[in-house]
Amino acid sequence: MKRRRLFFSVLLSILTLFINGPLITTAQSPPSSSTSCNRICGGIEIPFPFGIGRRDCFLNDWYEVVCNSTTSGKSLAPFLYKINRELVSITLRSSIDSSYGVVHIKSPVTSSGCSQRPVKPLPLNLTGKGSPFFITDSNRLVSVGCDNRALITDIESQITGCESSCDGDKSRLDKICGGYTCCQAKIPADRPQVIGVDLESSGGNTTQGGNCKVAFLTNETYSPANVTEPEQFYTNGFTVIELGWYFDTSDSRLTNPVGCVNLTETGIYTSAPSCVCEYGNFSGFGYSNCYCNQIGYRGNPYLPGGCIDIDECEEGKGLSSCGELTCVNVPGSWRCELNGVGKIKPLFPGLVLGFPLLFLVLGIWGLIKFVKKRRKIIRKRMFFKRNGGLLLKQQLTTRGGNVQSSKIFSSKELEKATDNFNMNRVLGQGGQGTVYKGMLVDGRIVAVKRSKVLDEDKVEEFINEVGVLSQINHRNIVKLMGCCLETEVPILVYEHIPNGDLFKRLHHDSDDYTMTWDVRLRISVEIAGALAYLHSAASTPVYHRDVKTTNILLDEKYRAKVSDFGTSRSINVDQTHLTTLVAGTFGYLDPEYFQTSQFTDKSDVYSFGVVLVELITGEKPFSVMRPEENRGLVSHFNEAMKQNRVLDIVDSRIKEGCTLEQVLAVAKLARRCLSLKGKKRPNMREVSVELERIRSSPEDLELHIEEEDEEECAMEINMDDSWSVDMTAPASLFDLSPKLDVEPLVPQRTW
């Protein structure tokens, strides 16, 4: 047995020598960015690119750390200079499994009723040229106390919050802050850079309530079992939140990163076996993150030579695998050598270097190939099940979807169609994933929607979109061509719509402007027809729940295509409404739905009314350029209707070529759609018929126009009045050009 073990050890040694070849075994020590730089403050290590003191101790101002006294004055603590927040820890990216470095900082607690005056800290602002920081999605909003309503503010167009109370069923104690004495909500997944916390009582009054209540952001997990009284959080004064950080490659200083040279945008590359850098894209900016190769190196990749070779022989890893052979360290690895050349001669002299070695190598190669193939099959089955494949089959069968019209694509087909998901083929990016342009083997152009890393909570949302689209067949609705469930993240394949979205065409000036009044009126007729089909003509009635101009795509002939069913819901024929979490977009959200959480077909009608107003005025749903009381487009339009000056707000680009009677007729129809009470609004079938009549019979309009009661004036959800959201970083929906994206902006409110 002993000789057999030695035999296999010899074969392993020869194979290792063959693969590795002669390698240099010396290791290098990394030079510091500056030998005199202080790397410790308050017991916390400050690794480069962060630093304290002189400018050569840190990369740039965003990475500067100031070592100051704490508020008590008894000790020193590190502070990030640019954002003036106390540091708790800094972590470099350690492996390919993480996509960025991590910084933990202290965040103040928002409170009310705990002292004579409420405490509302300033929002955390990470914006600025070259800012490497963003708020990771591992953080949560947590609120503790009775009758609380906590909101995350400064998130552009989204609503996120939660409520807690001390009344009701105490069985909710078993949940993780499920609403009894404490609650929590996820922050948006699109990495916001400005974020704050607002706190009020459930009655809406931020100054009353009497009892102490607190709210804060944190990456720690809380449950009723470990949540203390709100006074304790108020006394502590702060919690810990997590920030991600990366290198901005637009900085000229980082054209050649300090640790890895010759950065390119082709994905992963290595400047040496010890250091690996990875390129990515965030909010339109390129960035990189580097880490020491996990196999045989550790250290700081942002210093020249900072990744140091690990001596596996000294640490025991190599010794345990070499057995009776000698472990020899080599850069990034180790190898096993014979103690003496003479020992090999008495042991199978003609076999050691002959055919057995060849057969052994071939056998190992065949075994590895078989195992890899088997693992690949198992992984595909696992991904299919985890991505909701069984649920999708059940839904298609239950709903009577046309299975033949939706193809199940293989991952190889989609990799070939998108050139292995090349970044140059990206059509748009959103909160839920990335859309690529692809070409199938039969020449068809498609849009491939690749979701982000799978969240088990979103499996049902993904399957819902597939189930809804598989049963829809309408010329003005984006067609689902198929899906792929055998990859780690689910993938949807749609028909490609070449001319982008309606929002971009309405609000971006261009020399080849084609959005005349006739085109706009035709588009409104097509959208209304598509929504009417969803509400009443589809095999199962469907509420879209996120009707807006960014979800209306235009084909090569500028025909409207309704897209994005990520928040849609199918209903039974005898149902009149759905009770759901509030989901939608500021400026388009039905006030009645917002107040009752009951979504009806009239809620889609309201959102379509906002789209009609956009088509008439050419203005955005929300704009800080308008007076404060009319920043919302609905309020602005309603005021003009009251004062009989609708023609003053008609888009100047279409005034000369439009029929004013048609514009007035559409404006009055929009006003009916924007009625405060849903029962006063027409249904989508009536809206579609009326728009068809306006378009085809412009000479006979006044006979069919009904005046609305003044008390039924439209209202809207106003970001400033209803939620106290400070617009510090406006979204493209309001002030800036939007990204070309078929993803829904889905603000969510968790109660």
UniProtKB/Swiss-Prot annotation:
**Per its UniProt record, what InterPro entries does this chain match?**
Kinase-like_dom_sf, Prot_kinase_dom, Ser/Thr_kinase_AS, WAK, WAK-like
Regions crossing the membrane: 348-368
Residue ranges the record marks as coiled coil? none
Q: Which CDD domains match?
A: STKc_IRAK
Name the chain's protein.
Wall-associated receptor kinase-like 22
- Function of the molecule: Serine/threonine-protein kinase that may function as a signaling receptor of extracellular matrix component. Required during plant's response to pathogen infection.
Subcellular location(s) of the protein: Membrane
Q: What reaction does this catalyse?
A: L-seryl-[protein] + ATP = O-phospho-L-seryl-[protein] + ADP + H(+); L-threonyl-[protein] + ATP = O-phospho-L-threonyl-[protein] + ADP + H(+)
Residues with PTM Phosphothreonine: T580, T585
PANTHER family, per database record: WALL-ASSOCIATED RECEPTOR KINASE-LIKE 21 (PTHR27005), WALL-ASSOCIATED RECEPTOR KINASE-LIKE 22 (PTHR27005:SF385)
Cleaved signal peptide residues: 1-27
Q: Which gene encodes it?
A: WAKL22
Q: Which residues constitute the catalytic centre? A: D546 (proton acceptor)
